[in-house]
Each structure stands twice: as C-alpha cells, then as structure tokens.
C-alpha cells in the first residue's frame, strides 16, 4: 500500500445489515473478569481471529468481539499494520477492509495454540480444585450424590468426578425449561426428585445462586440426613 493510502483516516466500511442473531459473535475473550483480564496479546489475537473469518467487518463489530471501543480498535489495527500483520485494503476512497498478512496468519495460529493450551491448563486446574473440594465427602464414605444445577459449572463438575468413586445419581435444576432434557448423559430432574433418590449428598453446582439453593434444600437435607456442599 502506498504512503498516501495509509495516511487516510480509517472510518468504518459500510456494511450490509447482518442477519438477525448474527452478532455479537462468540469471543475468545471473557468480559467483566476480575481475575482473568485480557492482555494486549490476547486482544490482538482476538482481532486477528475475527479478521480471519471476515475482513470486511466494521471497527464497531471488531470492538464487540475484543471488548474495545472503536477508537481503541483503530489503534490496534494501526499497530498491527505497522508490524506487517494486517493490511488495509481500500474499499472505496473513504474506507477499508482489513486482511491478515501471511505473517499475521502465522502469528494468529501460534497465539491461538498457546491460548488454547492455557485454557486447557486452567480447565484442568479447576477440575483438580473441584476434586479436592469434594474429597471431604469421600472421606465420610459418601458415594451416591446429586448435582443441583444443570449449568456450565455442572458440566465441569461432572467431568471432574468422572474418574472418582462418586456415583452421580441425578442432576436437578429449578428451571422447568431444562427439566426432562438430557445433560451429559443425565435427564435433568425437578428438585422434587431429591425426596425419592437414594442419595447421600447434594453438591450445588451453581455459583450464582448457592445460598438460595442451599436454603431451598436445607429442610430436605435435615430430614434425610443429607450432606449439602457448596463449591
């Protein structure tokens, strides 16, 4: 690209109206995190990953995937261009589309591999923490348990318990829309099922509503002599 073309301002390229539900796309990053905050490298990866899928996206759409303002996306794009990782392709005399260069694609692949490796390590560490947490039940001779909460956390707990001595007899949830559906090999039941199941403990797998769920099942737990564990 010539010097004159790179000196132009970088307004958003005009875009056709997206299909309903097309945006926002799933992002590699997690918004509003206290402990796992995106680094500059992670944001660059997110932008490169998004551009690899569609280089005609506006800066607004790029900002949605990387949780950046339009002005910040503009700065990131300029930096990536200066590093030879992204090229600006004129769409008309006012706007651009953005394409990863060969070097940019190489960087995207290597960073994606490193990013995925970190996530796998984090996932493994989380499963280890869960196994350590529920080990106190095992020392009490408890084997037959139910999980309360058919959520993503519940999926992690089921995975963590897969190679243990625990026998998960049921997964229950308060949401009527979930009840009756399959969840990782279990049919999601109403909490009423806890009255009839031959369980020894209930593990609450909802981080967001642990106290409310604990209060909900406390009378049943007292009546049946069940252990109730919050994660």
Residue ranges of predicted features:
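Short alpha-helical segments that sit at the start of domains
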Residues: 23-46
């Amino acid at each position: 690209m010539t010097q004159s073309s790179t000196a132009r301002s970088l307004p958003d390229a005009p875009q056709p109206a997206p299909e309903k539900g097309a945006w926002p796309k799933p992002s590699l990053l997690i918004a509003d995190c206290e402990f796992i905050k995106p680094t500059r490298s992670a944001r660059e990866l997110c932008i490169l990953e998004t551009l690899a899928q569609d280089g005609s996206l506006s800066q607004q759409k790029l900002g949605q995937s990387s949780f950046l303002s339009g002005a910040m996306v503009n700065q990131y794009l300029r930096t990536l261009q200066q590093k030879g990782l992204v090229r600006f392709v004129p769409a008309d005399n006012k706007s651009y589309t953005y394409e990863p260069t060969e070097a940019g694609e190489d960087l995207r692949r290597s960073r994606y591999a490193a990013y995925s490796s970190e996530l796998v390590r984090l996932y493994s560490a989380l499963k280890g923490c869960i196994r350590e947490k529920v080990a106190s039940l095992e020392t009490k001779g408890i084997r037959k348990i139910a999980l309360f909460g058919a959520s993503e956390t519940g999926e992690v707990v089921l995975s963590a318990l897969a190679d243990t001595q625990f026998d998960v007899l049921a997964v229950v949830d308060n949401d009527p829309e979930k009840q009756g559906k399959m969840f990782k090999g279990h049919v999601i039941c109403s909490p009423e099922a806890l009255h009839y199941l031959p369980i020894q403990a209930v593990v609450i797998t909802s981080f967001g509503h642990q106290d409310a769920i604990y209060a909900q099942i406390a009378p049943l737990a007292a009546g049946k002599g069940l252990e109730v564990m919050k994660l």
